[in-house]
A protein has these predicted regions:
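A cross-family phosphate/adenosyl-ligand binding-site feature
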Residues: 1-222, 233
């Protein structure tokens, strides 16, 4: 089966040396890519330039939101993927223009803003790529979305997942992987996998368990293991 996995974080340029980004390392996406390669799937990893890369997958890199959007649309339309795992940390906003001491410049057009200047950034909202994936690839493609919260209560986590399923409507993902930044450590990566807004099909503690659970969920196999074999209302 052909699988596309996105990972890492977008970089939105301010000038030639400054940009806005996030803390995503691409570690989860790289791990999943190598896991599915070992399962003999044909994996393409669409990764941020500075992200951790998988060892065995075909790699395509992106830098900005615009890069990711163009490449993702093209891959979805031409490559006939059976599954798309969208783990990239996509910026909600891009820099539209910069005001330097009252003078306006389009984002990314200044070589380097001198220090000591008063700078104001005008941001523009980026479209939600998750809403486009099934539109581009077809509803037959299995789509896995990721939702990271930070210091959220259980109710807040559930509401964040519910918002994804409701917002996408006819093009909703098949599964949402939810985790909370406050619970992630060097050795532990707790996740919940939702099949719809109120049904948890797996709870995992490590990336290995997450990969195995997604493998079972995507291909319809039973999900075995402690904490990963029950469907809760």
């Amino acid at each position: 089966m052909k699988i596309l996995i996105t990972g890492g974080g977008t970089c939105e340029p301010i000038d030639s040396v400054r940009y806005i980004t996030n803390f995503s390392t691409g570690r989860t996406a790289a791990f999943l890519a190598d896991f599915f390669c070992a399962k003999k799937h044909e994996v393409t990893a669409l990764m941020a330039e500075n992200a951790q890369k998988p060892k065995n997958a075909k790699i395509i890199t992106y830098r900005t939101f615009s890069d990711l959007q163009k490449i993702l649309e093209s891959e979805c339309k031409i490559a006939n993927y059976g599954a798309i795992i969208h783990a990239a940390a996509v910026s909600d906003y891009s820099v539209q223009e910069i005001s330097v001491d009252g003078k306006i410049f389009p984002a990314g057009t200044i070589s380097k803003i001198p220090s000591g200047k008063n700078i104001f950034l005008k941001m523009q909202e980026n479209p939600k790529l998750l809403q486009k994936i099934k539109l581009w690839s077809g509803k037959q493609t299995k789509v896995v979305a990721f939702k990271l919260t930070s210091g959220a209560t259980e109710e807040e986590q559930q509401n964040a997942v519910k918002k994804i399923f409701l917002a996408e409507k006819d093009f909703a993902p098949d599964f949402v992987v939810q985790n909370d930044k406050s619970e992630i450590t060097a050795t532990s990566h707790p996740c919940k996998i939702y099949k719809n807004s109120d049904k948890i099909i797996a709870e995992t503690k490590t990336l290995q368990e997450l990969a195995e659970a997604l493998d079972g969920a995507l291909w319809g196999a039973p999900i075995e293991g402690v904490g990963r074999n029950e469907v809760r209302p």
